[in-house]
From Swiss-Prot:
Main location: membrane
Protein topology in the membrane: Single-pass membrane protein
Induction section of the entry: Expression of the proteinaceous toxin is probably controlled by an antisense sRNA, in this case RdlA. Only a few of these TA systems have been mechanistically characterized; the mechanisms used to control expression of the toxin gene are not necessarily the same.
One GO cellular component, as annotated: plasma membrane
Subcellular location: Cell inner membrane
Native species: Escherichia coli (strain K12)
Keywords on record: Cell inner membrane, Cell membrane, Membrane, Toxin-antitoxin system, Transmembrane, Transmembrane helix
Organism superkingdom: Bacteria
Keyword Transport tagged: no
Name of the molecule in the record: Small toxic polypeptide LdrA
Family under the similarity heading: Belongs to the Ldr toxic peptide family.
Membrane-crossing segments per the record: 8-28
Function: Toxic component of a type I toxin-antitoxin (TA) system. Inhibits ATP synthesis possibly due to its insertion in the cell inner membrane, ATP levels drop over 50% 2 minutes after induction. Overexpression is toxic leading to cell death, it inhibits cell growth within 30 minutes; C-terminally tagged versions of the protein are toxic while N-terminally tagged versions are not.
Amino acid sequence: MTLAQFAMIFWHDLAAPILAGIITAAIVSWWRNRK
């Protein structure tokens, strides 16, 4: 495994949950503002 491959796996493991959390928070806040 090269350093680039390790960095990509590490980035995806960190970025995926963070992005999911941001998207979820955005949808929840939009849903609350809509009501």
